[in-house]
């Protein structure tokens, strides 16, 4: 019985005002994506396991929701939309359709450990720019993220930008084995630089590389830190990565969004498919990034086609939590009109409701129970966020109540 009445851990029901606010927020963001010329795409909720296998670079297999179809194929609830978009780009889109701007809204499913207390099903809205490797494409993505968050109502937020190529150059210069590199990535991602120094010493990494990796803690801030990054760049690849960030920043000034941009050269990415710039968006009221994105120039190739690409995803649920904690209201405009009627006025009430609905007015219809007062229905209307209440009485009068101002008036109904 317990499992019959409760949802599994990590999923939840969303209804009434919260659901209306979530849909309104999603629609706002969707509109911004369309303003930038992005076209909608829908992908399946589940895919073959191969789409999210380890070699793709997405989340670990143990965090996937896996099941079998009747033929014995292993299927997976999507944990991430990007590999699906890559599959579509490689298999369905023709050469004449690139560069392609695609956007989506959908739920993703990740089997987080129970102790993390995180949602296992979340709603994402995102955009993917396929077929173009350029500073302009990178800058457009970042500008689009900023415009989306501003449209959501946020005023204080920050987009941290890094470059995987810079970080990877340091790893290559360290000459460590795969296991040590994975551990280093974890330590740096968690800002545990003491643990990193200890591990580098144990691995007998040369002093110059240790110093460069230790300097990552200082390579966080405004555009000025890029000069420092160029001084410790261990290779031409790393230097090119920093210069790319400088060029992107110049374009972002033209978009008038550079004030929201900071740099973090220690970013290495949660997913293994990132290849160039990587970015995350942060604001008050949520512990994790509300936006994650970056360039994945080699991902589509794993599905059989070479294609540079960049994209991002906004986690709607986390964004809503941040807005709520910052006391930023999400107007949704879903104000119903509540019509109640005495039993003898049913036909009139139905006709009036039909007239309202024909004019795109949300209308709820209830027959008044004899043992319930009008005040009961007024309270009900306020709880359901109705804007007004009309009471059709057997006396041929209509009592009108403005549930927002408390104003009342009586009119004679039409014959």
Q: What is the meaning of each model-derived region?
A:
Residues 1-6, 171, 176-183:
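Charged, compositionally biased N-terminal leader segments and the immediate start
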Residues 1-83, 139, 160:
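TRNA-binding/sensing appendages of the translation machinery
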Residues 4, 52-56, 170, 376-378, ...:
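Short secondary-structure transition/capping segments
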Residues 24-32, 48, 82-93, 102-132, ...:
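Positively charged, Gly/Ser-enriched RNA/tRNA-binding surfaces
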Residues 63-69, 176-197, 257:
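Acidic, His- and aromatic-enriched active-site or binding-groove loops in soluble protein domains
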Residues 97-98:
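Phosphate/dinucleotide-binding and metal-coordinating scaffold of catalytic cores
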Residues 120-125, 161-169:
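Short, conserved phosphate-binding/catalytic loop or strand-edge motifs used
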Residues 156-165, 184, 262-266:
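Short, surface-exposed recognition loops or helix-turn segments adjacent to catalytic cores
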């Amino acid at each position: 019985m317990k499992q019959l009445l409760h949802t599994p851990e990590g999923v939840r029901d969303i209804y009434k005002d919260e659901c209306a606010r979530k849909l309104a927020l999603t629609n706002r963001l969707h509109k911004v994506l369309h303003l930038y010329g992005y076209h909608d795409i829908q992908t399946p909720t589940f895919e073959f396991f191969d789409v999210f296998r380890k070699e793709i670079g997405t989340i670990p297999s143990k965090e996937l929701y896996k099941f079998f179809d009747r033929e014995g194929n292993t299927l997976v609830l999507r944990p991430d939309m990007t590999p699906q978009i890559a599959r579509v780009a490689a298999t369905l889109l023709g050469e004449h359709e690139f560069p392609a701007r695609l956007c989506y809204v959908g739920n993703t499913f990740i089997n987080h450990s129970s102790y993390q207390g995180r949602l296992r099903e979340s709603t994402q809205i995102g955009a993917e720019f396929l077929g173009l490797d350029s500073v302009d494409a990178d800058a457009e993505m970042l500008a689009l993220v900023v415009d989306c968050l501003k449209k959501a109502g946020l005023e204080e937020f920050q987009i941290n930008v890094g470059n995987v190529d810079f970080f990877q150059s340091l790893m290559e210069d360290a000459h460590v084995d795969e296991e040590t590199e994975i551990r280093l990535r974890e330590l740096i991602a968690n800002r545990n630089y003491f643990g990193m120094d200890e591990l580098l010493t144990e691995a007998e990494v040369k002093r110059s590389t240790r110093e460069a990796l230790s300097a990552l803690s200082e390579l966080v801030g405004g555009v000025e830190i890029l000069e420092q990054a160029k001084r410790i760049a261990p290779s031409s690849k790393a230097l090119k990565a920093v210069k790319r960030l400088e060029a992107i920043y110049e374009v972002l000034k033209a978009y008038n969004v550079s004030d929201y941009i900071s740099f973090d050269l220690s970013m290495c990415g949660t997913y293994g498919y990132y290849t160039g710039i990587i970015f995350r968006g942060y604001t008050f009221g949520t512990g994790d990034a509300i936006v994650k994105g970056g360039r994945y120039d080699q991902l589509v190739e794993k599905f059989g086609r070479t294609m540079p690409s960049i994209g991002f995803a906004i986690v709607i649920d986390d964004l809503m939590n941040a807005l709520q904690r910052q006391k930023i209201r999400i107007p949704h405009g879903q104000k119903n009109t509540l019509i109640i009627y005495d039993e003898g006025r049913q036909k009139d009430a139905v006709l009036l409701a039909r007239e309202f609905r024909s004019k795109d007015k949300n209308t709820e219809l209830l027959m008044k129970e004899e043992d319930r007062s009008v005040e009961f229905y007024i309270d009900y209307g306020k709880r359901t966020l109705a804007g007004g209440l009309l009471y059709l009485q057997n006396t041929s009068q209509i009592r009108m109540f403005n549930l927002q101002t408390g104003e009342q008036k009586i009119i004679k109904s039409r014959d």
